[in-house]
Amino acid sequence: MDNRIKMSGKKRPNTRAVKQQLFLNCGRVDMYSMEEYAKCKLELHHDPPFRYSHHTIYEESYLLSADSHRELHYLEQHNIDEYNYRMEIIRENKRILERKRG
């Protein structure tokens, strides 16, 4: 069963919805480690302070699947050349989308 907030389109969930879902997933924060809370928050709402790495392009993270996002974080830490190559592809795809919309 997937307890994540359903994201329609590209709009990020609002803070209240994220807090409610965090409470359902993690319970009271003082009952759990902050690491578990931060990991859950990262999955629900891509906020930079809760990231494990300096993954910089988070504004298009809604375009990526959860698996792709995890793989990018892994590549950022272990294979920076492949990470840079993939991020350049993501940037180029974003530019193409913006041109089509605009």
Regions found by a protein language model. Give the residues of each.
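A detector for short metal-coordination/catalytic motifs
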Residues: 58-60, 66-102
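Short, charged surface segments at domain edges that flank catalytic/cofactor-binding sites
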Residues: 1-34, 53-55
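Histidine-centered nuclease catalytic patch
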Residues: 31-63, 72, 76, 83
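Compositionally biased, intrinsically disordered low-complexity segments
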Residues: 8, 21, 39, 92-93, ...
